[in-house]
A protein has these predicted regions:
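Short helices/loops that flank or line small-molecule/ion binding pockets
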Residues: 5-19, 32, 82-83, 104-137, ...
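Ligand-binding "clamshell"
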Residues: 29-41, 56, 132, 137, ...
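A conserved helix-loop-strand patch within extracytoplasmic ligand-binding domains
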Residues: 41-91, 194
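Periplasmic-binding protein-like
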Residues: 42-53, 78-85, 144-186, 188-213
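Short mixed-charge
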Residues: 90-111
Length: 213
């Protein structure tokens, strides 16, 4: 069951006109939870999900039964499993080919050669668990808050190409053509904002305009 997010509840109730904190798969789960359609006004940047470790410098060093902390919310749990699969640490069942469409859970792991122990933890708490696990899959924003540099510190990062997890500016269908929303979307997609993201985060946050088609 998906938990309702207060930021989206505020938007649904008309207390705010837009929000900017989530990716599309998460928004879809919120539409289902709230019974409320939303509208995407702009895709702005990607905060790549990363795999981190204080115990190991390479995936080859992982022992049998290694512990892996992953986010416990539905969309980012699935995202973490796809990332682990991309580094051949697990293999999901056939049919799980589209991260934006096919939500995976640990029950959907078909092959787990290292017998990894998947530990579901609230996303903001995962950086604190780094000392206690072999690997931690951490959202980009929480990694940055914890003083990690994703582009340098992660053993593995999500690729930007064809990534469905861009952070988006979200509004309501009623407001999607409002000139103020359209101007905000234009500003967030401007070369100046893209340059600021690139200059400030050095590859740890990627402006959508930098993605390959």
């Amino acid at each position: 069951m998906c938990i309702r997010d207060s930021s989206n509840e505020l938007l649904a109730h008309g207390d705010v006109d837009a929000n900017y904190f989530q990716h599309l798969p998460y928004l879809k789960s919120q539409e289902e939870a709230l019974g409320q359609p939303f509208a995407v006004a702009a895709s702005v940047h990607i905060e790549p999900l990363g795999i981190y470790s204080k115990r190991h410098q390479r995936f080859e060093q992982l022992p049998q039964g290694a512990s892996v902390a992953v986010p416990n919310n539905v969309t980012n749990l699935s995202r973490a499993l796809y990332l682990l699969q991309s580094y051949q640490l697990i293999r999901l069942k056939p049919g799980f080919t589209d991260p934006a469409r096919d939500q995976a859970t640990p029950r959907d792991i078909a092959d787990n050669p290292k017998q990894l122990k998947i530990l579901e933890i609230e996303s903001p708490q995962i950086p604190r668990a780094l000392d206690d696990v072999d690997l931690a899959v951490i959202n980009g924003n929480y990694a940055l808050e914890a003083g990690l540099v994703p582009a340098k510190d992660a053993l593995g990062l999500e690729k930007a190409e064809h990534n469905p997890y861009a952070n988006i500016l979200v509004t309501t269908p009623k407001l999607q053509d409002d000139p103020r929303i359209r101007q905000l979307a234009k500003d967030l997609n401007s070369p100046e904002v893209a340059a600021f993201i690139t200059r400030t985060y050095s590859g740890s946050v990627i402006p959508v305009t930098d993605r390959q088609p």
